[in-house]
A protein has these predicted regions:
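Short, Lys/Arg-enriched N-terminal segments with co-localized hydrophobic residues
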Residues: 1-12
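Low-complexity intrinsically disordered segments
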Residues: 9-10, 24, 206
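Sec-dependent N-terminal signal peptides
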Residues: 16-25, 211-216
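A short, hydrophobic C-terminal helix/tail in secreted or cell-surface proteins
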Residues: 205-221
Length: 225
């Protein structure tokens, strides 16, 4: 079941993001968020699927949210459009793994998440986002909203892989680039919050490789004492 929170005048959403970001702006230092990474695979019928991750240096680091606000918008785009399965949804909250045997192509649905690849034990929330264009195969474009979980939710933790899943995106054709710019908030294992704005990614796949086109942005955190 998809859970969407509609917040009055968007004030609650702004406070949620601002509180996390302001707490991380006192000084900057070497961050334990190290950037974005990906996995990809062929999905059949001239489709290819990319999984996007936020990478960390400590297993206890956490990614708690992906957001957009007045300072930094968010977009995730594909040149040939995104594959959307009718039995899926815009987030991993809609992915029921019990249906994979009956509808194998559901495994390649396009969705966003915080750490969880399906609805099992998934505590993610969504605020202020209209998914209609994305669900029709179009882009994700957000100027004020977020998908997120709390620091109490295990799905936010980097774990032994030192990464947290952000989304799965399937597109049409090997010539179709998936690219975007996202903003992240989270918390390090020492309980210090961080914010990473304008994290750009863009990859063009090939039969045996993907070309990394770019990765840029800024992130801030409190200095360790």
């Amino acid at each position: 079941m998809l859970i969407v929170l509609y917040l009055p005048l968007e004030k609650t959403m702004k406070l949620l993001i601002q509180n996390l970001i302001i707490a991380s702006l006192s000084t900057s230092a070497m961050s334990e968020y190290v950037g974005l990474s990906f996995e990809y695979e062929e999905a059949g019928d001239d489709l290819w699927t990319m999984r996007l991750y936020a990478d960390f240096t400590e297993s206890t680091d956490q990614l708690t949210g992906v957001f957009a606000d007045s300072q930094s918008s968010l977009y995730i785009r594909s040149e040939n459009g995104f594959y959307q399965n009718p039995f899926g949804g815009p987030t991993s909250l809609s992915i029921n793994p019990a249906l994979f045997d009956v509808f194998p192509s559901l495994e390649y649905d396009s969705w966003v998440t915080i750490g969880s690849e399906d609805q099992i034990d998934n505590a993610m929330l969504v605020a202020g986002i209209d998914w209609s264009e994305f669900e029709n195969g179009g882009d994700i474009e957000i100027d004020n909203g977020a998908w997120f979980a709390t620091t109490d939710d295990i799905q936010t933790i980097a774990g032994n892989d030192l990464r947290v899943l952000i989304g799965q995106f399937t597109t049409y054709g090997w010539d179709s680039q998936i690219y975007g710019s996202i903003n992240l908030v989270g918390q390090y294992g020492d309980l210090e919050p961080f914010a990473a704005r304008d994290q750009y990614f863009g990859w063009v796949p090939g039969p045996s490789t993907i070309i990394v086109l770019g990765l840029a942005g800024i992130h801030t955190r409190r200095r360790r004492s």
